[in-house]
From Swiss-Prot:
InterPro entries associated with the record: Cys-tRNA-ligase, Cys-tRNA-synt_Ia_DALR, Cys-tRNA/MSH_ligase, Rossmann-like_a/b/a_fold, tRNA-synt_1_cat_dom, tRNAsynth_Ia_anticodon-bd
Reaction catalysed by this enzyme: tRNA(Cys) + L-cysteine + ATP = L-cysteinyl-tRNA(Cys) + AMP + diphosphate
Protein's name according to its UniProt entry: Cysteine--tRNA ligase
E.C. number(s) listed in UniProt: 6.1.1.16
Entry's Gene Ontology molecular function annotations: ATP binding; cysteine-tRNA ligase activity; zinc ion binding
Motif 'KMSKS' region, chain ranges: 270-274
Names of required cofactors: Zn(2+)
Cofactor note: Binds 1 zinc ion per subunit.
């Protein structure tokens, strides 16, 4: 059976085959690292973690690139606000991001380029766009992209420039000749530190956000590649602008397939700090183990909206316990390679081959768990574990998971909560720090603060 993927560009399911037989090249827009990663970032990273895992399960080589934006208005603002260098802030946030990724059990991307490493390539692209008449120097010193000069603008969002302009709110006082035009190179501002500036033919300045991804994707994957992914919020204008930049230079399709994961809402409301419903990955892992968080995310289809709530996480935990309970009954037999002709495996494959249909694939896991409960077959248990592994699930020790659910957190859970408590203390949120300490104490874990950090031990 062939793999079909929903392509945002065509707004249809299309049969997928890589440009280079046997090798998939995929680029996903990563984090702008001025703060800790939140549950929306976790959803995006988890979605493409599953995509990567499934492509590999089908025997394909995957070169997965997820970039890091380490220069941006928000990064500059946060560094100035905290009185530290941009480098100190980004190094801190990258380390925190990697810790969160590790705690979630995500497979790392093949490459993780940082925007500041590719500024010369960005300037080269801007020069090529200017030579083709697609970019112009503005009165304020910026270099902007002339949107109406690119014939294909709007094809990803499905709207013409006139339709898009009707909703544009950009004033022309910023040197743009059209509200839809966007900045490729930002001239240096008096308040910006020297480390946020590079020399160029246009004077000191820095790249715009959109040109960063065009440069990094081309440098790491080539002028055309198989899959470009990201959150639904990036479809317009970020991904639309990437297409205009890259295809404006090369004349070739930037990516054959465009994939966008759905939004995360919190108790059916948009997640925002002002509403008090903003949750970092560390906040979530302070309450729930990583396997529960993964199960909560992957049992929903990646394109659907995901509603975060304690009730839904609690339900995910109970559902996952059913799968681990089956695996605790009998040691799973090792599976060297999944036999995709086996009926359960065939159903699982059919589900995943239809636009990474994780809800239907998870349903197969539960059907298989019922069989394990009845038969106590090591072979059935082995298949359950192997299929779960395609989603990054069921690879932990079943008894440890079930015992942790009974009230004793495991090592990874404890360390995640310690990290969340440290972050709360750093932000002087001592009430939250105390809440985490007391929650662990209620589960029989005592935290001890020392000169070298926080350690823990079981309560006597």
């Amino acid at each position: 059976m062939s793999l079909r993927i929903y392509n945002t560009l065509s707004r249809a399911l299309e049969e997928f085959s890589p440009l280079e037989p046997g090798h998939v090249r995929m680029y996903v827009c990563g984090m702008t690292i001025y703060d800790l990663c939140h549950i929306g970032h976790a959803r995006m990273m988890m979605a493409f973690d599953v995509v990567q895992r499934w492509l590999k399960a089908r025997g394909l080589k995957v070169t997965y690139v997820r970039n890091i934006t380490d220069i941006d208005d928000k990064i500059i603002g946060r560094a100035l606000e905290r009185g530290i260098t941009i480098g100190a802030l980004t190094d801190e946030m990258i380390a925190a991001m990697h810790a969160d990724i590790g705690a979630l059990g995500l497979e790392p991307p093949t490459l993780e380029p940082r925007a500041t490493q590719y500024v010369p390539r960005m300037l080269a692209l801007i020069g090529q766009l200017q030579a083709k008449g697609l970019a112009y120097r503005a009165s304020n010193g910026d270099v902007n992209y002339a949107v109406r000069k690119f014939q294909g603008y709007g094809k990803l969002s499905g709207k013409s420039p006139d339709e898009l302009r009707a909703g544009a709110r950009v004033a022309l006082a910023d040197g743009k000749t059209d509200p839809l035009d966007f900045v490729l190179w930002k001239s240096a501002k008096p308040h910006e530190p020297p480390e946020a500036q590079w020399d160029s033919d246009y004077g000191r300045g820095r790249p715009g956000w959109h040109i960063e991804c065009s440069a990094m994707s081309c440098a790491t994957l080539g002028e055309s590649f198989d899959i470009h992914g990201g959150g639904a919020d990036l479809q317009f204008p970020h991904h639309e602008n990437e297409i205009a930049q890259s295809e404006g230079v090369t004349g070739k399709p930037l990516a054959r397939f465009w994939l966008h994961n759905g939004f995360v809402r919190v108790d059916n409301e948009k997640m925002s700090k002002s509403l008090g419903n903003f949750f970092t990955i560390r906040d979530v892992l302070a309450q729930y183990d990583a396997q529960t968080v993964r199960f909560f995310i992957v049992r929903a289809h990646y394109r659907s909206a995901l509603n975060y709530s304690d009730a839904h996480l609690d339900d995910a935990r109970q559902a996952l316990k059913r799968l681990y309970t089956a695996l605790s009954l009998v040691p799973p037999a090792p599976v060297a390679a999944i036999d995709w002709t086996e009926p359960h495996a065939a159903r699982f494959q059919a589900a995943m081959d239809e636009d990474f249909g994780t809800p239907e694939a998870v349903a197969v896991l539960f059907d298989l768990a019922v069989e394990v409960n009845k038969s106590h077959s090591p072979q059935r248990a082995g298949l359950l574990k192997a299929l779960g592994g395609c989603l990054g699930l069921l690879q932990g020790d079943p008894r440890a998971f079930l015992q942790a659910g009974a009230g004793t957190p495991d090592e990874a859970d404890i360390q995640a909560r310690i990290a969340a408590r440290a972050a709360a203390k750093a932000q002087r949120d001592f009430a939250e720090a105390d809440r985490i300490r007391n929650a662990l104490l209620a589960q029989g874990i005592v935290l001890k603060d020392g000169a070298t950090g926080t350690t823990w031990e079981a309560a006597q």
